C-alpha cells in the first residue's frame, strides 16, 4: 500500500464518538462560499471519493445544490452525516421549526444528523437574511439564546434532527446554554487552525463531553479573509513538516491532520475536484510535530463577525490581522 493510499484510508476511517455514542466522521466537506452551480458537483465528487460528512447552512444559499449532490452521489443517506445551521433571522422559538423545514425541503432530506445555532446573534424574524432599516442598519431582535436552545431541543422529539449544537459561541454564551439545557450540545463548531488553536476552550469542551468541529482549517486561504500575514498553509513550519512526510503531503494535509490529531473533526471547503481529493488525507502527527506547529507565534481570527451587535468572541483567544 502506498503512503497516499494509507493517508486516504486514514481519512476514511477516522471518526469521533459523541456523548450519545454516535460517531461523527473526522473529515468532512464544508460548503460555505461554494459558488453557485458548483456546489452540487463538489458534494457529489466528495461523497463519491470517500467523504461522509457534508456541512451546510441556510445562510450559504446553496442547500438545494447540496441536496442534489447528495442525491446524485449514489451514497446511501444512512452513510452520510449531514450538518446544517439555524440562521440569525430565525431565533424566535416559533421560527425555529419553520427554518428546519425549509432546510430539509431544500436539502430534500427527511432528517439532519446535526443542527446548530449558527451564531449567538438574533436578527429581526422573517424571510430577509440581513434585515435592514431605511438607513441601511441591521435590525436586531431580542430573542434570548436560552429560548432558542429550548426550541432546538424540541426538534429532537420530531425525529427530524438527531443532534443539536452550537457554532461561534464564546464561553459566556456557552455557559448560558448549559444552565438551561435539558439536552447538552453535542457539537460546537468554531474557527480553529494553527493561527487560532483556542486550546483552553477546546479542552473545556472535551471535559464537558461536547465534540468540537474546526471550520476554516486553512486559516486565511479563503480569499474573503484579507490578511497582511502569510498564508497559513504556506508557513515555513507547516511546509517543513509536510516535506518531512514525503510525496503528496501538502500544507493543507498538515493543517487537516493537526485538527484531527488534537481531537477535533474538520471541514475544509473546496469546489475544485483535485483539491477536494487532495484535502482528503490524514496523517497522525507526532508529539514533536504538534509541538512545533503549536509553537507558531502568529495569532489571528479571520472570521470577525462584523454583522454582530455584540462582541461574540469576547474572552476568547483572538487576533486582528
Curated annotation (Swiss-Prot):
The record places the site described as Lowers pKa of active site Tyr at 85
Q: Which GO terms describe its molecular function?
A: aldose reductase (NADPH) activity
Q: What class of enzyme is it?
A: oxidoreductase
A GO cellular component entry from the record: nucleus
**Which InterPro entries would you find in this protein's record?**
AKR, Aldo/ket_reductase_CS, NADP_OxRdtase_dom, NADP_OxRdtase_dom_sf
What highest taxon heads this organism's lineage?
Eukaryota
| EC id | 1.-.-.-
Active-site annotation: 60 (proton donor)
Positions contributing to substrate binding? 118
SUPFAM superfamilies (alphabetical): NAD(P)-linked oxidoreductase
PROSITE patterns to which the protein is assigned, alphabetical: ALDOKETO_REDUCTASE_1, ALDOKETO_REDUCTASE_2
Gene3D superfamilies given for it?
A: NADP-dependent oxidoreductase domain
Quick one: a GO biological-process term for this protein?
cellular detoxification
Q: Provide this UniProt record's keywords sorted from A to Z.
A: Oxidoreductase
The family note in this entry says:
Belongs to the aldo/keto reductase family.
User: Could you identify this protein by its name?
Assistant: Uncharacterized oxidoreductase C26F1.07
Amino acid at each position: 500500500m502506498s503512503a497516499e493510499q494509507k493517508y486516504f484510508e486514514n481519512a476514511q476511517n477516522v471518526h469521533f464518538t459523541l456523548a450519545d455514542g454516535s460517531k461523527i466522521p473526522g473529515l468532512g466537506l464544508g460548503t460555505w462560499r461554494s459558488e453557485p452551480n458548483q456546489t452540487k458537483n463538489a458534494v457529489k465528487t466528495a461523497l463519491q471519493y470517500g467523504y461522509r460528512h457534508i456541512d451546510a447552512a441556510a445562510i450559504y444559499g446553496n442547500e438545494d445544490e447540496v441536496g442534489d449532490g447528495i442525491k446524485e452521489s449514489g451514497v446511501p443517506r444512512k452513510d452520510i452525516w449531514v450538518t446544517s445551521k439555524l440562521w440569525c433571522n430565525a431565533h424566535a422559538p416559533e421560527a425555529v421549526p419553520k427554518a428546519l423545514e425549509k432546510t430539509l425541503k431544500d436539502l430534500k432530506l427527511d432528517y439532519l444528523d446535526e443542527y446548530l445555532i449558527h451564531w449567538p446573534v438574533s436578527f429581526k424574524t422573517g424571510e430577509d437574511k440581513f434585515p435592514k432599516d431605511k438607513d441601511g442598519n441591521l435590525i436586531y431582535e431580542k430573542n434570548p439564546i436560552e429560548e432558542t436552545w429550548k426550541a432546538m431541543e424540541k426538534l429532537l422529539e420530531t425525529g427530524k434532527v438527531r443532534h443539536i449544537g452550537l457554532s461561534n459561541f464564546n464561553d459566556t454564551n456557552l455557559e448560558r446554554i448549559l444552565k438551561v439545557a435539558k439536552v447538552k450540545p453535542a457539537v460546537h463548531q468554531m474557527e480553529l487552525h494553527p493561527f487560532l488553536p483556542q486550546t483552553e476552550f477546546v479542552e473545556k469542551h472535551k471535559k464537558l463531553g461536547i465534540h468540537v468541529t474546526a471550520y476554516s482549517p486553512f486559516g486565511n486561504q479563503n480569499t474573503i479573509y484579507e490578511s497582511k500575514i502569510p498564508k497559513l498553509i504556506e508557513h515555513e513550519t507547516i511546509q517543513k513538516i509536510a516535506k518531512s512526510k514525503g510525496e503528496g503531503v501538502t500544507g493543507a494535509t498538515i493543517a487537516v491532520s493537526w485538527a484531527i490529531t488534537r481531537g477535533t473533526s474538520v471541514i475544509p471547503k473546496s469546489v475544485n475536484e483535485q483539491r477536494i481529493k487532495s484535502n482528503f488525507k490524514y496523517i497522525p502527527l507526532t508529539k514533536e510535530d504538534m509541538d512545533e506547529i503549536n509553537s507558531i507565534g502568529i495569532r489571528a481570527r479571520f472570521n470577525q463577525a462584523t454583522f454582530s451587535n455584540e462582541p461574540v468572541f469576547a474572552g476568547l483567544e483572538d487576533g486582528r490581522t
